[in-house]
């Protein structure tokens, strides 16, 4: 069974975001995908190994070991403060210690060149995520610009150039537009 098949529901929650994610990716110097199984349409059809492989020239890092991508983005942001870094993660990763540490550190260091997108589909293996996740969202409040988004429109995003930005995309697992949904280019 392919990995795509195992993660279809996660894949589908990201699908409505494709147009806004493409815009965010195009406007970034580095792109890190911490939820690679949510981005299958961006990979070549024959691409099977997601990881440190750089054969996808416009995705700099994609990890199946969840929780690493934001810390890696932090290192890049420190090393290259004039470069824009885009990171996509799942909401479940906000329960991981290394992700929470990176959020605090990025905010404390005011790494304003990071844009973090969170696929907030409120679902995890143990049930409804919001019951345990809401307190973790407070970790962003002191030093991040928090953008809650339900429209999936790039123009609705209000970035703050003086802070790191986090976009909490309100999605629903396995609910997306018709199967013929087209990416706007």
Language model segments and positions:
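Generic low-polarity alpha-helical segments
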Residues: 1, 12, 17-21, 31-33, ...
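Cofactor-binding active-site loop characterized by glycine-rich and histidine/acidic residues
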Residues: 2-109
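Glycine-rich ThDP/TPP pyrophosphate-binding loop and its adjacent helix/strand module
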Residues: 59-185
């Amino acid at each position: 069974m392919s990995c795509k098949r195992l993660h279809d529901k996660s894949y589908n929650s990201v699908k409505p975001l494709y147009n806004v994610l493409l815009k965010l990716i195009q406007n970034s110097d580095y792109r890190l995908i911490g939820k690679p199984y949510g981005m299958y349409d961006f990979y070549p059809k024959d691409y099977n190994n997601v990881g440190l492989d750089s054969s996808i020239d416009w995705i700099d890092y994609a990890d199946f070991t969840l929780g690493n991508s934001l810390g890696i983005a932090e290192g890049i942001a420190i090393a290259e403060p004039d470069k824009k870094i885009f990171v996509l993660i799942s909401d479940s990763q906000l329960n991981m210690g290394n992700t929470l540490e990176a959020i605090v550190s990025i905010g404390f260091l005011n790494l304003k060149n990071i844009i973090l997108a969170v696929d907030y589909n409120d679902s995890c293996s143990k049930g409804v995520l919001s019951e345990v996740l809401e307190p973790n969202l407070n970790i962003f409040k002191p030093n991040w610009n928090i953008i809650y988004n339900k429209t999936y429109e790039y123009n609705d995003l209000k970035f703050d150039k003086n802070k790191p930005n986090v976009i909490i995309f309100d999605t629903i697992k396995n609910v997306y537009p018709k199967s013929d949904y087209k990416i706007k280019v």
